[in-house]
Amino acid sequence: MYKRIMVAVDGSEIAQQALAEGINIANTYNATLCIVNCIGGENDTDKNKGNEILEKAKSDTDVLSVETRLLNAEAEYGLNGIADAIAAAVYDWKADLIVVGTSNRRGLERFYVGSVAEQLVAKVDSSILLVRSK
């Protein structure tokens, strides 16, 4: 069913839960997994942190021998930039499933802050699995 699964990670607990779901699905369908992290700028600190996040995520996949790709996507600052960078990565890599974590924001906080996951739904044609925090 799914052959190319992309998981967006940012080092948060909910991203770890999304990664676990992505690994499980990739293992079930013998799919290739692409782990993507958005970096916000040209500075080395952002790139180094992005690489650390990806390497940590990759170590989680090595245990199950899931074929994995790592990708740092450069994003403009702000939620739109992150969603745009992930959407571009989805199209470039031709992912057929995207797995992302989503917070449980409600009310005014959700209105003002928004959601990368929400924006992805509007930007991509691939299936999206939203993983809520437990």
Whereabouts are the PLM-identified features?
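Charged helix-capping and loop-helix junction motifs
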Residues: K49-I53, G81-I86, V113-A117
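General small-molecule cofactor/ligand-binding pocket signal
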Residues: V36, E67-L71, L129
